């Protein structure tokens, strides 16, 4: 099982120097990937906040801009969005930005995507929330087609998208029933929201069963979870439990207040947790 960690592209940690120190330390470690998230325009107050978003996230660096930043300051580690809210962005521009990250990073980008949920952000961006699933499928279809064809059609216009997209692994985020079928049809795996190993086990099995029926034996599961690192044995047992139910890439998420603190957590995940995996 691969191991990753979050890197916060928001708040007081989202400065060039802070992000560079953290990303380059992770790059020098044996950590497999670092992950970051997406918000475009946060309202001053939230009516619906199921994921406990901080009321004031401070500065939020765009994840695709951050991906290009990481491409230039790292050389080995993979990095990805957990998740990119894909209906927020125009299809062709999204394709261009992802292709640019892939080219500049040597194909190290991992694309976790989600259809979004925040009513206020959809309203601010002028995107109908009711069409988020359809828009998501349209953009994923374009990404897949542009990685295979020199010419693609967008809004009735044939265009050549260059650089041609080296398709990154696409992980479909969320626990909605449509996520797994979408992953099988248009992605490379599933990225569920924080769930226990027992909760994930039947869904991962269902994904592989349905995937096999569709000729897809390559599907992976990426899962983000805050491991109880202060309790070493408990954290190792939990990581092993995720591995046992079929999680392919476990991402530890937590806050940190300095590059040195970030480095300590990276060392715990890449050292103690990795050593404890079966």
Model-derived regions, located:
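Active-site-adjacent structural elements that line small-molecule/cofactor binding pockets in enzymes
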Residues: 1-278
């Amino acid at each position: 099982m691969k191991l990753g960690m979050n890197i916060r592209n928001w708040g007081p940690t989202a400065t060039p120097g802070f992000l560079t120190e953290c990303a380059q330390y992770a790059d020098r470690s044996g950590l497999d990937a670092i992950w970051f998230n997406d918000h475009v325009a946060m309202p001053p107050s939230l009516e619906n906040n199921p994921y406990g978003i901080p009321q004031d996230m401070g500065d939020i660096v765009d994840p695709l801009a951050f991906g290009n930043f990481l491409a230039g300051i790292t050389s080995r580690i993979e990095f990805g969005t957990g998740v990119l809210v894909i209906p927020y962005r125009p299809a062709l521009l999204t394709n261009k930005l992802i292709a640019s990250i892939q080219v500049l990073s040597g194909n190290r980008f991992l694309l976790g995507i989600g259809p979004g949920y925040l009513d206020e952000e959809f309203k601010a961006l002028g995107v109908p929330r009711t069409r988020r699933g359809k828009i998501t499928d349209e953009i994923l279809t374009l990404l897949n087609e542009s990685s295979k064809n020199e010419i693609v059609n967008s809004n009735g216009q044939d265009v050549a998208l260059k650089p041609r997209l080296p398709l990154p692994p696409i992980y479909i985020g969320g626990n909605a029933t449509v996520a797994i079928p979408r992953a099988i049809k248009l992605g490379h795996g599933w990225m569920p929201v924080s769930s226990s190993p027992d909760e994930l086990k039947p869904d991962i099995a269902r994904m592989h069963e349905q995937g096999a029926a569709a000729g897809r034996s390559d599907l992976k599961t990426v899962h983000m979870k805050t491991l109880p690192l202060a309790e070493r044995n408990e954290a190792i047992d939990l990581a092993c439990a995720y591995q046992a139910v079929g999680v392919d890439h476990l991402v530890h998420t937590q806050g940190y207040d300095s590059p040195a603190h970030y480095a300590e957590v990276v060392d715990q995940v890449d050292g103690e947790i990795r050593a404890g995996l079966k």
